[in-house]
Regions:
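Intrinsically disordered/low-complexity terminal segments and short unstructured peptides
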Residues: 6, 30, 62-64
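Compact, glycine-rich, soluble single-domain proteins
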Residues: 43-182
């Protein structure tokens, strides 16, 4: 239709309706633009790096078998729910003899997964006395498969994938913690 008298409809009696409709279209376009930009900017959070909580760093000892001397490891301690939930997510490199120690208030069956974890990990589950309950070798990065303790565990030690085999960790392995960490 030709635009007459500055109105889309061409009739003076529709002026107010046309102006109102154009105003609503402008508001609609602004809303669509904002809603289209915000999700692209915010994302769904799945691929975004979550700020890591602060972790205490301690030295622990692991006796791979009763016949061997203890081996020292430098570990970050995850003892709060937030720390345990974050764990080693988004870590792209873990130096040799470094890891994370998950500390729980009491023994219970434990499940871990590798969500947002970029490196393979060995998971060693220990009871309150530091005895090995179960060991998972080289858990696959990013896997949502649940890794079970297969018994009650109070501590879980995560190391680089392959380190448990490298240091010949056996079923009689013991975790030795500093007194303040127990």
């Amino acid at each position: 239709m030709w635009r007459l008298s500055g109105n889309w409809c061409g009739a003076n009696w529709l002026c107010r309706r046309c102006d109102a409709a154009l105003g609503l279209w402008r508001v609609f376009i602004v809303i669509v633009c904002v809603l289209g930009v915000v999700p692209a900017w915010a994302g769904d959070g799945a691929d975004q790096t979550v700020s890591a909580p602060d972790f205490a760093v301690i030295e622990i000892k692991l006796t791979p078998t009763h016949q061997r001397a203890p081996i020292s490891f430098t570990v970050k301690v995850a003892e709060t729910e937030r720390q345990r939930r974050h764990g080693l997510m988004f870590v792209s490199h873990l130096p040799e003899r470094h890891g994370m120690l998950f500390v729980f208030e009491s023994e219970a069956p434990r499940q871990f997964w590798m969500k947002n974890t970029q490196i393979p990990l060995d998971m060693l589950f220990f009871d309150s006395a530091g005895r090995l309950v179960n060991m998972i070798h080289a858990a696959v990065p990013f896997s949502l498969t649940r890794r079970n303790s297969n018994g009650s565990a109070r501590y879980v030690l995560e190391l680089n994938g392959g380190e448990a085999a490298k240091f010949d960790v056996q079923s009689d392995a013991r975790l030795l913690l500093p007194l303040a960490s127990q």
